[in-house]
Design a protein with these regions (language model features):
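Secondary-structure junction motif
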Residues: 94-100, 141-143, 175, 183-211, ...
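Hydrophobic hinge/microswitch elements
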Residues: 127-131, 137, 196-253
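Alpha-helical linker/hinge and terminal dimerization helices associated
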Residues: 34-35, 56-78, 85, 93, ...
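A short LG(V/I)-centered, amphipathic sequence patch enriched
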Residues: 30-51
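Flexible hinge/capping segments at coil-to-helix
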Residues: 149-191
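Beta-alpha-beta core module
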Residues: 152-158, 163, 224-273
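Short helix-boundary/capping micro-motifs
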Residues: 2-20
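Central regulatory/effector-binding core of bacterial HTH transcription factors
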Residues: 81-145, 220
Length: 290
């Protein structure tokens, strides 16, 4: 079931698993019948998970991971391999905390995943139990919509820190010497933001004040691209200012933005699941940046 979901096609999953397509189709139908839910919707392009299917797959992943741990320990006599996955918005401090987690984790066998992704995908990853924890922010602008989604997905948000907005730009930028900036100061320059796929709205934006009109907009998918565009085209982005050196560089600075808004950055987990030991270590590492 997991492979079918990952491939988005029963035919492709059958090829990957070296079994016949009819056999796999029958197996999927049998699981759906026994579970009493429709896990996949079928179409010409392949298959897609239903809402019930997403929940089913989340539990299925947990079962498979536990079986792998049992097999490694009691059959292969290997030390268990721990898995820990974080889905996060594009923050440097989440990466630094992840590095600290790995440095503190002494076992030889592990699978750690740091997934910088879109806001809605963070919620989906945690909901489907692909990720143990998700990192995102809430503000006056997005709180109502995100809170509704958290309720729908049975997730809980825990605030870690509260930050004031800062403008990130290159050290040689015409505005770099200003001690404080206003939104109107930024109008002549390209606004840089992260793409949100099918959820391009202020409610899922990683940047504050995304509804404020801008003549020049550039959207990217990763932090390295944003840094290059800040330097190459004198663009800017608005973020927390918690850790002002993107990618450990000295070319980018942050300047406080004189606007009445705050970013409440926190973590998201499933309501029915407590933080694991690795989760607690990671959260403690995040708290150091408050």
């Amino acid at each position: 079931m997991i492979t079918v979901a990952e491939k988005g096609s029963i035919t492709e999953a059958a090829k990957f698993l070296f079994i016949s397509q009819p056999s796999l189709s029958d197996a999927v139908r049998q699981v759906e019948k026994e579970a009493g839910v429709t896990i996949f919707t079928r179409c010409r392009a392949g298959v897609a998970l239903t809402k019930e299917g997403m929940e089913f797959l989340g539990y299925a992943r947990q079962v498979v991971q536990q079986m792998e741990l049992l097999e490694a320990k009691y059959i292969n006599n290997e030390p268990p391999r721990q898995r820990f996955c974080v889905s996060t918005q594009h923050y440097t401090f989440t990466t630094n905390a992840f590095v600290e987690l790995i440095q503190k984790f002494g076992q030889e066998r592990f699978e750690f995943i740091l997934n910088e992704t879109q806001t809605h995908q963070i919620l989906e990853d945690v909901r489907n139990r692909f990720s143990d924890i998700g990192i995102l922010y809430m503000s006056q602008e997005n709180e109502s919509v995100l809170t509704k989604l958290l309720e729908e997905y049975d997730l809980q948000f825990y605030e870690l820190l509260c930050a004031s907005p800062h403008v990130f730009l290159r050290r040689g930028h015409p505005l770099a010497q200003r001690p404080l900036l206003k939104l109107e100061d930024l109008k002549p320059y390209p606004r840089l933001s992260f793409v949100q796929g099918n959820y391009e709205s202020a409610y899922f934006s990683e940047e504050l004040f995304s509804t404020v009109p801008a003549e020049k907009n550039i959207k990217v998918s990763d932090r390295a691209a944003i840094v290059n565009l800040m330097i190459g085209v004198s663009g800017y982005t608005i973020s927390s200012g918690i850790f002002p050196k993107y990618l450990q560089g000295d070319d980018i600075i942050s300047i406080p933005l004189d606007e009445q808004e705050t970013m409440r950055i926190g973590y998201v987990i499933n309501r029915d699941k407590e933080l694991s030991e690795l989760g607690r270590i990671y959260v403690e590492a995040l708290k150091k940046f408050r």
